[in-house]
Amino acid sequence: MLFALPALNDNYIWLYQRENLPLIIVDLPETDKLFAWLDKQNATVEAVLLTHEHDDHTQGVSAFKKRYPTVPIYGPQECEKKGATQIVNEGKILTANYQIDVIPTGGHTKQHVSFLVDNHLFCGDALFSAGCGRVFTGNYALMFEGLQRLNTLPDETIVCPAHEYTLGNLAFAETVLVDKSAVEKSAVEKSAVEKQRIFVETQRAENKPSLPTTLKLEREINPFLQAKTLEEFTALRKAKDIF
């Protein structure tokens, strides 16, 4: 089971569960909706994963710990002050039922991490559908390196970003991407970006998430994954900042 629980203005709390096992929660922007969902599902929690320190990912930690004091909360070093109980900057996490890969994806924050659980990538604010996070550290090389790590994962990887930013990202992508495959196949055939935009507009009109996405699709529609060099990535990211 994979579920995107809307939170705050445009965040998602991701919940992942193998059948009949306790679930994993990714990021804690708030807890009221989360606790209501957990109660309704009569769910048990195995672990919480924090991708980075920003408040819109961690401000629910205190309330969560009061209700679930024994559940481990994993996160990078920068999340210790936010309430993380287990510090992980890279490597593997072994819980009772899950093996989780921790992938360094800094740049948005210095120690931002992404988590790979089975074939599900929980990438916080590092990678978005058709976009990537702002580089608040100013370290574009760190951000580029992190995205390059994610770009080595298989096509079938299910990508679970933390924000509903897809439509805005697609608008930017349409200005910078040329879909060669569509040109070669037929002048009438819509580009991958345009097709995805139509899908996302339909989803959002029905108040449904545009996510998750897949790495295969992102390789077609995401200019930041297509960037071949640090210079190209940096230029794209700076252009998106003022788009």
From Swiss-Prot:
Transmembrane in keyword set:
no
Write down the top EC class of this protein: hydrolase
Where along the chain is Zn(2+) 2 bound? D56, H57, D125, H163
Name the Gene Ontology molecular function terms of this record.
hydroxyacylglutathione hydrolase activity; metal ion binding
Question: Could you give the cofactor binding note from the entry?
Answer: Binds 2 Zn(2+) ions per subunit.
Against InterPro entries, the record matches this protein to:
Clx_II_MBL, Glyoxalase_II_hydrolase, HAGH_C, Hydroxyacylglutathione_Hdrlase, Metallo-B-lactamas, RibonucZ/Hydroxyglut_hydro
The pathway this protein participates in, as annotated, is: Secondary metabolite metabolism; methylglyoxal degradation; (R)-lactate from methylglyoxal: step 2/2
Required cofactors, per record?
Zn(2+)
Q: What is its EC number?
A: 3.1.2.6
List of residues binding Zn(2+) 1: H52, H54, H108, D125
Any Pfam family from its record, for instance, is Lactamase_B
Query: What keywords would UniProt list here?
Result: Hydrolase, Metal-binding, Zinc
Function, as annotated, reads: Thiolesterase that catalyzes the hydrolysis of S-D-lactoyl-glutathione to form glutathione and D-lactic acid.
Which NCBIfam families does this one have? Answer: GSH_gloB
Q: Which family does it belong to?
A: Belongs to the metallo-beta-lactamase superfamily. Glyoxalase II family.
Query: How does this polypeptide assemble, per the annotation?
Result: Monomer.
PANTHER family cross-referenced by the UniProt entry:
HYDROXYACYLGLUTATHIONE HYDROLASE, HYDROXYACYLGLUTATHIONE HYDROLASE GLOB
The name this protein carries in UniProt is Hydroxyacylglutathione hydrolase
